[in-house]
Amino acid sequence: MKVSDQKIEVIAHQEEKSFIEGDKPLLKMKPERLAGMFGALPAEKRKEAEAKFLESLKSKVDKTVDDGEVLSYCGGITVIFTPGHTPGHIGLYLNQYKTLITGDALNVVDGQLVGPNAEFTPDMDTAKKSLEKFTQYDVETVICYHGGVYQGNVKERLLELAKG
């Protein structure tokens, strides 16, 4: 976003804003992860590289949204607050297209729709409870950050995942 010559509007849930803007440390950027990324550098360069990297992840949030809010883009996009993967994680339902964008709340693995990845989800119990919200929508297509598009028995699969 920082290298784009276009204005990119950053929209997030209020619970996520302080992480995006850098007021709170990112939950997944633990020292051991940073060490894995920058461990090959000499000690005097490592801290500088880590600081520059963490600074590069920060962005100003232009607008905060709440659960159930409908954005005017694409014929209406409903915000679905789905904490668990992060405290302010959201999904988006494109009303006109019956398409659910789940971010990291769901994944597609080997063509199958599966739940959140426990390795990258700090609050698995909350993440699983959040899946129930997806069953309230008339979904024909699911788009996941990891794994891409899932179509087929979407409604049935969402109900199965919500039940655990």
Regions found by a protein language model. Give the residues of each.
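A short acidic, often aromatic-flanked loop/helix-cap motif at beta-alpha or helix-coil junctions
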Residues: S18-F19, E69-S72
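Acidic/His-rich, metal-assisted hydrolase cores and their charged scaffolds
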Residues: K163-G164
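Metallo-beta-lactamase
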Residues: F53-S56, K60, V70, G76-P83, ...
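Active-site HxH/HxHxD metal-binding segment of metal-dependent hydrolases
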Residues: M1-K63
